[in-house]
Amino acid sequence: MRIGHGYDVHRFAEGDFITLGGVRIAHHHGLLAHSDGDVVLHALSDALLGAAALGDIGKHFPDTDPTFKGADSRVLLRHVVGLIHAKGWKVGNVDNTIVAQAPKMAPHIESMRALIAADLQIELDQVNVKATTTEKLGFTGREEGIAVHSVALLLRA
Protein backbone atom coordinates (compact mmCIF):
# COMPACT_ATOMS: atom_id res chain seq x y z
CA MET A 1 0.00 0.00 0.00
CA ARG A 2 1.25 3.49 -0.88
CA ILE A 3 0.02 7.00 -0.10
CA GLY A 4 0.68 10.07 -2.25
CA HIS A 5 -0.04 13.75 -1.76
CA GLY A 6 -0.49 16.29 -4.52
CA TYR A 7 -0.81 20.06 -4.41
CA ASP A 8 -1.39 22.53 -7.19
CA VAL A 9 -2.28 26.18 -7.60
CA HIS A 10 -3.45 28.21 -10.57
CA ARG A 11 -3.84 31.95 -10.76
CA PHE A 12 -7.03 33.49 -12.09
CA ALA A 13 -6.80 35.12 -15.52
CA GLU A 14 -9.20 36.51 -18.09
CA GLY A 15 -11.96 34.16 -19.06
CA ASP A 16 -15.55 33.23 -18.33
CA PHE A 17 -15.22 29.67 -17.02
CA ILE A 18 -12.92 27.34 -15.13
CA THR A 19 -12.58 23.57 -15.36
CA LEU A 20 -12.34 21.68 -12.07
CA GLY A 21 -12.47 17.92 -11.71
CA GLY A 22 -13.38 17.73 -15.40
CA VAL A 23 -16.43 19.97 -14.90
CA ARG A 24 -16.76 23.28 -16.75
CA ILE A 25 -17.97 25.95 -14.29
CA ALA A 26 -19.11 29.44 -15.28
CA HIS A 27 -17.02 32.08 -13.51
CA HIS A 28 -15.95 35.68 -14.04
CA HIS A 29 -12.34 34.50 -14.49
CA GLY A 30 -10.48 31.66 -16.15
CA LEU A 31 -7.35 29.97 -14.82
CA LEU A 32 -3.87 30.70 -16.16
CA ALA A 33 -2.22 27.46 -17.28
CA HIS A 34 -0.38 25.71 -20.09
CA SER A 35 -3.05 22.99 -20.24
CA ASP A 36 -6.75 23.46 -19.47
CA GLY A 37 -5.84 24.56 -15.93
CA ASP A 38 -7.82 21.85 -14.11
CA VAL A 39 -6.12 22.31 -10.76
CA VAL A 40 -8.09 19.41 -9.21
CA LEU A 41 -6.90 16.87 -11.77
CA HIS A 42 -3.36 18.26 -11.66
CA ALA A 43 -3.11 17.82 -7.88
CA LEU A 44 -4.72 14.39 -8.16
CA SER A 45 -2.30 13.32 -10.90
CA ASP A 46 0.61 14.42 -8.70
CA ALA A 47 -0.77 12.43 -5.75
CA LEU A 48 -1.08 9.29 -7.88
CA LEU A 49 2.36 9.70 -9.44
CA GLY A 50 3.89 10.38 -6.03
CA ALA A 51 2.33 7.28 -4.48
CA ALA A 52 3.77 5.15 -7.28
CA ALA A 53 7.18 6.89 -7.07
CA LEU A 54 6.80 8.08 -10.67
CA GLY A 55 7.70 11.74 -10.20
CA ASP A 56 5.19 14.48 -10.92
CA ILE A 57 3.09 15.89 -13.73
CA GLY A 58 5.85 18.32 -14.70
CA LYS A 59 8.07 15.35 -15.49
CA HIS A 60 5.45 13.57 -17.59
CA PHE A 61 3.70 16.59 -19.16
CA PRO A 62 6.19 19.50 -19.19
CA ASP A 63 4.77 22.96 -19.76
CA THR A 64 7.63 23.57 -22.20
CA ASP A 65 6.21 20.92 -24.55
CA PRO A 66 3.75 22.42 -27.07
CA THR A 67 2.02 19.02 -27.27
CA PHE A 68 0.35 19.78 -23.94
CA LYS A 69 -0.75 23.35 -24.75
CA GLY A 70 -4.46 23.48 -23.88
CA ALA A 71 -4.43 19.74 -23.07
CA ASP A 72 -7.51 18.15 -21.53
CA SER A 73 -6.45 17.20 -18.01
CA ARG A 74 -8.81 14.21 -18.05
CA VAL A 75 -6.70 12.75 -20.87
CA LEU A 76 -3.56 13.39 -18.81
CA LEU A 77 -5.13 11.76 -15.73
CA ARG A 78 -6.08 8.67 -17.73
CA HIS A 79 -2.46 8.44 -18.91
CA VAL A 80 -1.31 8.60 -15.28
CA VAL A 81 -3.73 5.78 -14.42
CA GLY A 82 -2.15 3.68 -17.17
CA LEU A 83 1.30 4.33 -15.71
CA ILE A 84 0.31 3.26 -12.20
CA HIS A 85 -1.49 0.17 -13.52
CA ALA A 86 1.64 -0.75 -15.50
CA LYS A 87 3.63 -0.65 -12.24
CA GLY A 88 1.20 -3.09 -10.61
CA TRP A 89 -0.90 -0.63 -8.60
CA LYS A 90 -4.60 0.16 -8.45
CA VAL A 91 -6.35 3.09 -6.80
CA GLY A 92 -7.77 2.37 -3.35
CA ASN A 93 -9.31 5.80 -2.83
CA VAL A 94 -8.68 9.49 -3.43
CA ASP A 95 -9.56 12.59 -1.41
CA ASN A 96 -9.41 16.09 -2.90
CA THR A 97 -9.77 19.44 -1.11
CA ILE A 98 -10.44 22.53 -3.22
CA VAL A 99 -9.41 25.79 -1.54
CA ALA A 100 -11.24 28.72 -3.15
CA GLN A 101 -13.29 31.71 -2.10
CA ALA A 102 -15.31 31.51 -5.31
CA PRO A 103 -17.06 30.09 -7.21
CA LYS A 104 -19.28 27.94 -5.00
CA MET A 105 -18.30 24.31 -5.52
CA ALA A 106 -21.23 22.47 -3.90
CA PRO A 107 -23.38 22.34 -7.06
CA HIS A 108 -20.51 20.69 -8.98
CA ILE A 109 -19.04 18.23 -6.47
CA GLU A 110 -21.06 15.16 -7.49
CA SER A 111 -20.28 15.68 -11.18
CA MET A 112 -16.58 15.97 -10.35
CA ARG A 113 -16.70 12.76 -8.31
CA ALA A 114 -18.40 10.87 -11.13
CA LEU A 115 -15.89 11.99 -13.78
CA ILE A 116 -12.91 11.28 -11.54
CA ALA A 117 -14.24 7.81 -10.67
CA ALA A 118 -14.70 7.05 -14.37
CA ASP A 119 -11.19 8.24 -15.27
CA LEU A 120 -9.61 6.31 -12.39
CA GLN A 121 -11.67 3.19 -13.22
CA ILE A 122 -12.96 2.97 -9.63
CA GLU A 123 -16.30 3.20 -7.84
CA LEU A 124 -17.89 6.49 -6.86
CA ASP A 125 -17.53 5.70 -3.15
CA GLN A 126 -13.75 5.62 -3.62
CA VAL A 127 -13.67 9.30 -4.62
CA ASN A 128 -14.14 12.30 -2.36
CA VAL A 129 -14.15 15.95 -3.38
CA LYS A 130 -14.72 18.71 -0.88
CA ALA A 131 -14.23 22.46 -0.86
CA THR A 132 -13.36 25.08 1.69
CA THR A 133 -12.50 28.76 1.84
CA THR A 134 -9.75 30.53 3.73
CA GLU A 135 -12.21 33.04 5.24
CA LYS A 136 -10.95 35.67 2.76
CA LEU A 137 -7.33 35.24 3.90
CA GLY A 138 -4.36 34.73 1.57
CA PHE A 139 -4.31 34.54 -2.22
CA THR A 140 -7.34 32.24 -2.43
CA GLY A 141 -9.28 34.46 -0.03
CA ARG A 142 -8.49 37.50 -2.17
CA GLU A 143 -9.77 35.50 -5.17
CA GLU A 144 -6.40 35.55 -6.91
CA GLY A 145 -6.48 31.83 -7.64
CA ILE A 146 -7.45 28.32 -6.58
CA ALA A 147 -5.43 25.69 -4.70
CA VAL A 148 -6.09 21.97 -4.34
CA HIS A 149 -4.69 19.27 -2.05
CA SER A 150 -5.14 15.65 -3.11
CA VAL A 151 -4.33 12.41 -1.33
CA ALA A 152 -4.31 9.03 -3.06
CA LEU A 153 -4.07 5.51 -1.67
CA LEU A 154 -2.67 2.87 -4.02
CA LEU A 155 -3.00 -0.87 -3.46
CA ARG A 156 -1.21 -3.73 -5.17
CA ALA A 157 -3.31 -4.88 -8.12
Swiss-Prot record:
Pfam families: YgbB. One of its GO terms (molecular function) is 2-C-methyl-D-erythritol 2,4-cyclodiphosphate synthase activity. Binds 1 divalent metal cation per subunit. It catalyses: 4-CDP-2-C-methyl-D-erythritol 2-phosphate = 2-C-methyl-D-erythritol 2,4-cyclic diphosphate + CMP. The record marks 34, 133 as: Transition state stabilizer. Pathway: Isoprenoid biosynthesis; isopentenyl diphosphate biosynthesis via DXP pathway; isopentenyl diphosphate from 1-deoxy-D-xylulose 5-phosphate: step 4/6. Its cofactor is a divalent metal cation. Homotrimer. Involved in the biosynthesis of isopentenyl diphosphate (IPP) and dimethylallyl diphosphate (DMAPP), two major building blocks of isoprenoid compounds. Catalyzes the conversion of 4-diphosphocytidyl-2-C-methyl-D-erythritol 2-phosphate (CDP-ME2P) to 2-C-methyl-D-erythritol 2,4-cyclodiphosphate (ME-CPP) with a corresponding release of cytidine 5-monophosphate (CMP). This is 2-C-methyl-D-erythritol 2,4-cyclodiphosphate synthase. It comes from Pseudomonas fluorescens (strain SBW25). The gene is ispF.
